[in-house]
Structure formats: C-alpha cells, structure tokens
C-alpha cells in the first residue's frame, strides 16, 4: 500500500500540475505542437509531455528554456499559477 502524501508533498504535486497546465496553455497559444517545442528546446517530446502532465519535476534550467522558447515569463512560486 502506498503511503499517504504529506501536505508539503501534496502541495508540490499540485504546483507541478498547475505549472504543467500553464506550460501547455502557453505552448498552444503560441501555436506549437509538443514536437515543435521539443525541437526548439532540444529536448525529447516525451519530456514535454511528462512536464505538462505533472509527471516530471521541472528544473530551473528547463523553466528558463521554456520561458525563452515560448517568450513567456513564468512565476516560480505563485499560488495563482
């Protein structure tokens, strides 16, 4: 049986999901497919999919790459992401 997540782990999971949603929304507004954005960022399309679905903990390096590639300023910690 899987252990219950602590409040902090739940919050991290929630932020990951919200940030992934925001990245997907911005990507779609900019007219990029996951494949096109992956090529622009020089990463795998599957990595973008995992990030957008909250399955991958994004690093600051990736956040900067998304920001530059999508011409969008992401807020690192914002409860209203």
What name fits each language-model region?
Residues 17, 28-29, 57:
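Short amphipathic helical patch at the helix-1/turn junction of helix-turn-helix
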Residues 36, 47, 62:
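Residues in the helix-turn-helix
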Residues 59-76:
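DNA major-groove recognition helix of helix-turn-helix/homeodomain DNA-binding modules
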């Amino acid at each position: 049986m899987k252990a219950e997540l602590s409040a902090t782990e739940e919050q991290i999971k929630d932020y990951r999901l919200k940030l992934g949603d925001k990245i997907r929304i911005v990507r779609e507004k900019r007219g990029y497919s996951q494949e096109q954005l992956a090529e622009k960022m020089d990463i795998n399309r599957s990595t973008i999919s995992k990030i957008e679905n909250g399955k991958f903990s994004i690093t600051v390096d990736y956040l900067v790459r998304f920001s530059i590639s999508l011409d969008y300023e992401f807020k690192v910690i914002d409860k209203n992401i």
